[in-house]
């Protein structure tokens, strides 16, 4: 179990570091990056007022973690839990709802919805939002 936890932590840390460093050069060519940052490209964080911006990838990763922790907590506290995909799906739907123009979900399990920077509308990919908003997210994986 410790190896799995370490792998998950490493994956999430890598995502956070990569997102914090890379969001400023996302969808830009190498030439454009060199023009702005020099011949070696981006070598560190491009901070605004001392902070890296929170992007849709950061938001989605945080909500995914919230789902995993919610499932683990439920399992520890109540001695029963559904497969993780159920909790991750629930958290993903709540994040997707926070990205819609009409606002937040009516029922929320994610305390992250109280953090404005984690609900700021970043994601304009309607296909992804539609997919994550479906109530059956993860059900096909459970019934295999």
Where do the PLM segments sit?
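Structured, active/binding-site neighborhoods that engage oxygen-rich ligands
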Residues: 1-142
